[in-house]
């Protein structure tokens, strides 16, 4: 177990990330809030990623720490989970190796989670931020992912049950109380950021900072992509309603196995999501 002597543990899971990794680490080193430690686990890269990590660990001992084990390639999800179960810290942030964090990201996120902990002491809390979507050269595609999609996240966290991915892991900060709710993992756990979202919705609270604080780089090797398309009700899918219901039935069974309640709860949440998205796409950003 790695015990973080600072306030925030930034967990960076990387695989074959030589192209962008140094730029991301440099953006972390440029943060205005300094009370953090970076923990990096390489997932068996075959490029120059291990050498890049080694160089930064030597240049910033105690600030940047390589988490090493003999388990080799775990995959994106389990690489993040391994970091989370290995590091003990008051607060955590997931970090992708191909993004760029704006200088105020850690400070703004930490300030907001502390404000919410004062309002709601002792419970799991997650704070997410907006992000700017860029191409691989950091040319801006969408200044705000949320507004490009017409998706106000505050409308959905009130559901207390999230049948969609609500929080991008790289935008989040969360406290130890939420980390403790993420283990033990079910055998068929979803991706790390979806599991984070689900546990926060189930046991705690989710809050949003309506500022883009990372440059999210879109390129051909992303493990996950930005959801920017504006939601419209899928009228053309009415003919496919039976197959859609079969798919949702399988999804509802999956969430039921994870302990998120009955089928009715899932389908009510889906219906509320559709209604709220129709409202959100017409209003979000107009009053801000």
Give, region by region, the residue ranges found by the protein language model.
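Terminal low-complexity segments of carbohydrate-biosynthetic enzymes
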Residues: 229-288
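Nucleotide-sugar donor-binding/catalytic module of glycosyltransferases
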Residues: 1-228
């Amino acid at each position: 177990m790695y015990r973080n002597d600072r306030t925030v543990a930034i967990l960076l899971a990387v695989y074959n990330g030589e192209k962008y990794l140094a730029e991301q680490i440099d953006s972390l080193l440029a943060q205005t809030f300094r009370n953090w430690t970076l923990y990096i686990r390489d997932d068996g890269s075959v490029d120059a990623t291990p050498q890049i990590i080694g160089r930064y660990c030597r240049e910033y001992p105690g600030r940047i720490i390589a988490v090493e084990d003999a388990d080799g390639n775990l995959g994106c999800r389990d690489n993040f989970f391994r970091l989370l179960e290995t590091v003990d810290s008051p607060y955590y942030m997931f970090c992708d190796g191909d993004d760029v964090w704006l200088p105020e990201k850690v400070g703004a996120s930490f300030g907001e989670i502390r404000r919410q902990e004062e309002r709601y002491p002792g419970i799991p809390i997650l704070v997410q931020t907006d992000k700017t979507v860029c191409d691989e050269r950091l040319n801006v595609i969408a200044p705000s992912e949320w507004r490009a999609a017409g998706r106000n996240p505050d409308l959905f966290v009130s559901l207390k049950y999230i049948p969609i991915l609500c929080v991008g892991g790289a935008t989040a900060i969360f406290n130890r109380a939420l980390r403790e709710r993420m283990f033990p993992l079910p055998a068929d756990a979803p991706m790390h950021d979806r599991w984070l979202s689900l546990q926060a919705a189930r046991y705690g609270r989710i809050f949003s900072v309506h500022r883009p604080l990372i440059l999210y780089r879109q390129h051909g090797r992303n493990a996950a992509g930005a959801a920017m398309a504006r939601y419209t009700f899928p009228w053309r899918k009415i003919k496919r309603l039976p197959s859609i219901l079969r798919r949702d039935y399988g999804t509802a069974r999956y969430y039921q196995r994870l302990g998120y309640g009955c089928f009715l709860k899932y389908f009510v949440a889906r219906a509320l999501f559709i209604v709220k998205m129709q409202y959100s796409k017409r209003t979000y950003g107009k009053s801000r």
